[in-house]
Amino acid sequence: MGATKSKPREGGPRSRSLDIAEGSHQPFTSLSASQTPSKSLDSHRPSGQPFGGNCDLTPFGGVNFSDTITSPQRTGPLAGGVTTFVALYDYESRTETDLSFRKGERLQIVNNTEGDWWLARSLSSGQTGYIPSNYVAPSDSIQAEEWYLGKITRREAERLLLSLENPRGTFLVRESETTKGAYCLSVSDYDASRGLNVKHYKIRKLDSGGFYITSRTQFSSLQQLVAYYSKHADGLCHRLTAVCPTAKPQTQGLSKDAWEIPRDSLRLELKLGQGCFGEVWMGTWNGTTRVAIKTLKPGTMSPEAFLQEAQVMKKLRHEKLVQLYAVVSEEPIYIVTEYMSKGSLLDFLKGEMGRYLRLPQLVDMAAQIASGMAYVERMNYVHRDLRAANILVGENLVCKVADFGLARLIEDNEYTARQGAKFPIKWTAPEAALYGRFTIKSDVWSFGILLTELTTKGRVPYPGMVNREVLDQVERGYRMPCPPDCPESLHDLMFQCWRKDPEERPTFEYLQAFLEDYFTATEPQYQPGDNL
């Protein structure tokens, strides 16, 4: 089907089938030849105005946002004069200037100076319009292969492959995290002792340009390697049976130039939550695109200050941060973000699904949050209100950090007094609660409290204690005891987050690495290829 400027429809996740050309599977037989995280320098933005907010609901309600696993960004600036790209997904236009296209369609890039949205012409229909740059890849490149997911982590690969719907032998190819220029083949497996698990095989490059997992079987391209192992296990845990499914990625923004948008372009459809400072709605932008909309009560924050902060927030882009799409900057302020289907982590933990979560899932969710916060740390930003109510959950237990930075702008007296009823004392580091010193290290303290929310399935921290009592006791050195059924190693991690001296608390980089490796510290990084 050719490209059109038709009325968009919501598209679902793409399903992937193994489609390998005949004759491409023959190898050629030439026979030529736990990471310790570094402690980053923590810097922070000026603490600015004190914040707070301690109602049962998050300041913006217990919300719901995007329900997709973000597919990795697989395209970049055009190199070597390449202007012909292939579509990785279907895309339906959202505005009159967008171009609809179908997966597999070939597109000529007219102008790629527009950042996230490129002007392109369909080679099948001849029509021209803007396309999301992360929905296409250079024709005939490795990035255009369905099974190639680029720069995703080992843990993210396992998260995708361990879906119960995947048959044994489901696979993907990604960049190696440990060896520059090498790749990794990740394959789902099953055995009676371990149940579902994932095996990782390093794909090495030959000086001559070929590829191999074991030196006795070599290939001229990754496509040949995948085709061969789809027919022969030849020492792998299983032959390759199906490409790992992923969902469409979020576009970077709603469309080209859609940032400050008119209020009447939004339709509020279903109220999802209500908090101290506003409401959260599921809605539609421009009649085409599902979004979440936060409506702030007039007087909650200065529109000018919000717009200035939002310009910074929209530049924060990470697969574990809820994406800020657009704003209505006149009061009542609207904040438009990606929509996630499972609501806030707090509601999720306390709800029906919470009872089925076991330690591996809880640790994985914590690792995802730490990953998003490690990015915030690298960007020298501060969240200021990190807790389960401000984490959002999508399909497949995907977690994303929301509401970063907004707390600094709130002007409500009960929020800014730091002792008021709306201030989240129980999550706040003592130096922030007492003196307004909000840094990435006070976020680390809050993360330790969030870990107790995870391990207790949403219990309020410091049970039986009121805010004033918590502040007094913490100042005297009190720390929460180990929650029931929580491993001592996790409780020790919480204690590290609650050290009195902020500089002695771990970095989010360290927390991410610790949690991602929590169950894999004794496993080899890769299966031994030359023993196949």
Curated annotation (Swiss-Prot):
ATP binds at L272, G273, Q274, G275, C276, F277, G278, E279, V280, K294. It is an enzyme of class 2 (transferase). Residues 7-19 have a biased composition (Basic and acidic residues). GO terms for molecular function: ATP binding; non-membrane spanning protein tyrosine kinase activity; signaling receptor binding. The active site is at D385. InterPro entries: Kinase-like_dom_sf (IPR011009), Non-receptor_tyrosine_kinases (IPR050198), Prot_kinase_dom (IPR000719), Protein_kinase_ATP_BS (IPR017441), Ser-Thr/Tyr_kinase_cat_dom (IPR001245), SH2 (IPR000980), SH2_dom_sf (IPR036860), SH3-like_dom_sf (IPR036028). Its main location: membrane. The keyword Lipoprotein applies. One of its GO terms (cellular component) is plasma membrane. PROSITE patterns: PROTEIN_KINASE_ATP, PROTEIN_KINASE_DOM, PROTEIN_KINASE_TYR, SH2, SH3. Residues 26-40 have a biased composition (Polar residues). Residues 80-141 form the SH3 domain. Residues 1-56 are annotated as: Disordered. Belongs to the protein kinase superfamily. Tyr protein kinase family. SRC subfamily. This is Tyrosine-protein kinase Src-2. It comes from Xenopus laevis.
